[in-house]
Structures are given as structure tokens and as C-alpha cells.
């Protein structure tokens, strides 16, 4: 099932979670940070295709619509391994001693997994000069913090989406202007929130604007004091929430049935609900928003790097980006995808914010894995292990 419809935003099994986080924590020290940013023997050209490409993907990220033409053109036969969560992707990449174990060549990782893979030495740097479409990406996704460390690229961005505030227009005659509607008692029992530890960043972003004295400048880099304040807010929110949704379809059903009136979601849910004549709209409040972005990353032990580079080159082209965007309710990274999108579905470029102004993109704080290193030479930030534990306490 496709990513936007059925992608799980919550938890993998405890075994997968433990395996993923243990190595991630080990890779977040100074030596890991240094080596992650160290350039190493990047290829200057794409060699002869090896004939095979093994991908870990969000289900449907290599649909026949664009996979079959790639196979015919390159001779690279694509083999797929679907993953249902970021934790599962990390765990799969760490089979066989890590780095894909020689079994997997690439992974379509989201921002809450990419730094775990980089600092865990599971992926290798890539030469974006070999990916012509990269130069046409929106600036925010050319060298984002979630896949580029100290100027070294560990993959190429693919699709992205903002986390928007969705609301019932009959209950809200005008658009809410603040995320505060999700934290106030007025809509108790009518609120829906994603069931994902990275949701902590949304609360931190809200506090960065409403409680500036906390000094939050990056919602993914929180000191203990900032983190505790954020968790306290989420615990106060808990009694107000009708449902923590695991799948986009769960939130769609809740809005369609009238069970909820307002919540955090993606443009996919909004457009799907509108197609069903449900009175909803979406907005990005004054505090800004978080957002997810996926990256095709090259496994450190990839046996078919040439086919991998050809795949990155292929999926970065405007037409393929447009095909995937419309297939999943996502927004392409390539700015030249819009004409292809509109040709396929009139007005879709605007519907998915692909033609949004720079200010819109700048208002989005894209997911990245929380690590102990705050980037200031100190290791006083709360890492992802603690985020996961705290989220269990909030929602359990």
C-alpha cells in the first residue's frame, strides 16, 4: 500500500527498536561525527551497470510506472524490500554487520532515520554532481541537515511534505492562526495527533515561539530543560486528544466521521477528505511547521553502486518526481516537476505546494534525528532514545 495511505508513523517492534537505537546512540559521539563529515573517494563517473539493484523502500516507492522504464534503459533489475517504519529501515540496514550487510544497496530513509544511518556508518557519501536533477532541487533540500554533514552528501532528497494543521471548516469559520488550538481545552476530545516520537519537535516549535525564554532555536536540538518543558506540554495535551493516529487513513476516517475537528496531518489527508466532500482545509500557523523529507541513501556495503547512482539519477528527473508525487500525495524536490504534475492532474502543483514561495519553504523545519551533539561543541542535547521513551510515557 502506498506511503501516504498506509505508512506507519509510529513504532516498530521492541526488538527492532532496541537494535536500531543501540547502534545509533553509539554512533553519536565525537568520533562518529567527525568521520561522518569526512570526504572519501567519491566516484567521478558512473561505471558499467552491475545488472542488479536491491532497495529498501517505503511500500510503492518503486512502482512499475517508473521502475520498469528504468530497468529497460539501464539493465539494472530492481529487487524490493518494503519497510513499514523508519526503525525497521534502520534495522534492515544493520543486518549482516551493518551498512546494508552486502544485501541492500539503497534505502529511502526519512529524516528521523538518516542521521542514525550516517553516524552509524551504514551509508556512504555520494557525489551529487553525478545527479543532474539535483541542481534543480529546491534550495532547502539540496544540502539539508538531515542528509548532509559538514558539506558531505549522504544521498539525494526525493519527496517531502509539510505537517499541516487540518481543520473542519464548519467548526472553524476562519483558519486557526496558531498551533495552540491543539493544546487548549476548547476542543477537548476533538483533536488528532500523529503517533510518532518526532511529534515532540512540533510541540518544541510551538514553545519556541510562545515561550521564547526557553531559548529553543532548533526543535530537534533540545537541552534537558527545553525537552522537559516540551514533554510537560504534551502530557497536558494528552487528555485533550481523541486519537493518536498511526496511519493517514486513520485520520481521514476520524475527520470524515466527525469524530475530530482539528489535528496535525499532511496535504494528502486534506486532499483526500476534500475529494470525499468533507468540509476541511489546512493551514500552516504563525509558528511555522515541521515537515518530513525522504532521501535515497547508498549503503556502505552496496554491491551495485553503479546501478544505485543510475537510480538516484533516474528518480531525480522531473517526470519521475511528478509521477511519484501524484502517486503518494507528496511534493517533489525537483522544481521542474510542476509542468509534468499539472499535465497529469490540472492544478496539482499548487495543491501540493510545489510552486510555493520561498517564505513557505523557509517556514518548515524538516525532520532530522535528535542526537546528543547540539552542534555547539557540547553534548547536552537529548537524543532520540530519550525521545522515544518520553513519547511512550506521553501516549501510553
Across the structure, where does each feature detected by a protein language model lie?
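Short, low-complexity disordered leader/linker segments with a strong preference
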Residues: 1-52
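Oxyanion-binding "anion nests"
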Residues: 244-275
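Early extracytoplasmic/lumenal segment of secretory-pathway proteins
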Residues: 28, 37-116
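Mature extracytoplasmic/periplasmic domains
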Residues: 299-365
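Extracytoplasmic/periplasmic substrate-recognition and gating elements
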Residues: 265, 274-327, 396
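Paired acidic/hydrophobic, glycine-rich loop segments that form the ligand-binding mouth/hinge
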Residues: 102-108, 244, 261-266, 281-282
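Conserved C-terminal helix/tail region of periplasmic/extracytoplasmic solute-binding proteins
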Residues: 361-396
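Extracytoplasmic ligand-binding site segments that recognize negatively charged/polar headgroups
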Residues: 56-64, 86-88, 103-104, 108-256
Amino acid at each position: 500500500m502506498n506511503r501516504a495511505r498506509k505508512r506507519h508513523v509510529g513504532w516498530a517492534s521492541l526488538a527492532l527498536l532496541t537494535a536500531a537505537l543501540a547502534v545509533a546512540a553509539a554512533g553519536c559521539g565525537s568520533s562518529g561525527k567527525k568521520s561522518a563529515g569526512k570526504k572519501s573517494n567519491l566516484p567521478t563517473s558512473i561505471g558499467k551497470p552491475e545488472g542488479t539493484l536491491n532497495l529498501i523502500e517505503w511500500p510503492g516507492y518503486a512502482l512499475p510506472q517508473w521502475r520498469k522504464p528504468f530497468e529497460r534503459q539501464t539493465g539494472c533489475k530492481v529487487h524490493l524490500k518494503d519497510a513499514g517504519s523508519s526503525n525497521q529501515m534502520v534495522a534492515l540496514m544493520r543486518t549482516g554487520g551493518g551498512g546494508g550487510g552486502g544485501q541492500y544497496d539503497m534505502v529511502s530513509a526519512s529524516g528521523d532515520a538518516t542521521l542514525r544511518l550516517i553516524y552509524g556508518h551504514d551509508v556512504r557519501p555520494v557525489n551529487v554532481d553525478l545527479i543532474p536533477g539535483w541542481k534543480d532541487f529546491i534550495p532547502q533540500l539540496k544540502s539539508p541537515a538531515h542528509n548532509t554533514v559538514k558539506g558531505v552528501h549522504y544521498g539525494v532528497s526525493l519527496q517531502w511534505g509539510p505537517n499541516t494543521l487540518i481543520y473542519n471548516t464548519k467548526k472553524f469559520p476562519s483558519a486557526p492562526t496558531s498551533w495552540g488550538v491543539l493544546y487548549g481545552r476548547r476542543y477537548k476530545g476533538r483533536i488528532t495527533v500523529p503517533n510518532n516520537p518526532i511529534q515532540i519537535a512540533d510541540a518544541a516549535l510551538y514553545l519556541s515561539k510562545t515561550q521564547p525564554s526557553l531559548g529553543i532555536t532548533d526543535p530537534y536540538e533540545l537541552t534537558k530543560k527545553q525537552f522537559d518543558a516540551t514533554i510537560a506540554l504534551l502530557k497536558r495535551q494528552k487528555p485533550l486528544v481523541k486519537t493518536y493516529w498511526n496511519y493517514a487513513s486513520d485520520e481521514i476516517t476520524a475527520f470524515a466521521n466527525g469524530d475530530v475537528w482539528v489535528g496535525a496531518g499532511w496535504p494528502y489527508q486534506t486532499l483526500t477528505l476534500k475529494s470525499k466532500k468533507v468540509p476541511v482545509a489546512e493551514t500552516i500557523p504563525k509558528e511555522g511547521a515541521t515537515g518530513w523529507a525522504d532521501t535515497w541513501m547508498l549503503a556502505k556495503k552496496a554491491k551495485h553502486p553503479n546501478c544505485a547512482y543510475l537510480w538516484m539519477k533516474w528518480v531525480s528527473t522531473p517526470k519521475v518526481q511528478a509521477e511519484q508525487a501524484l502517486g503518494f500525495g507528496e511534493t517533489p524536490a525537483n522544481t521542474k516537476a510542476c509542468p509534468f504534475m499539472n499535465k497529469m492532474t490540472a492544478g496539482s502543483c499548487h495543491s501540493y505546494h510545489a510552486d510555493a514561495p520561498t517564505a513557505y519553504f523557509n517556514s518548515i523545519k524538516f525532520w532530522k534525528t535528535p542526537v546528543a551533539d547540539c552542534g555547539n561543541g557540547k553534548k547536552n542535547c537529548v537524543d532520540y532514545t530519550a525521545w522515544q521513551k518520553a513519547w511512550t510515557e506521553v501516549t501510553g
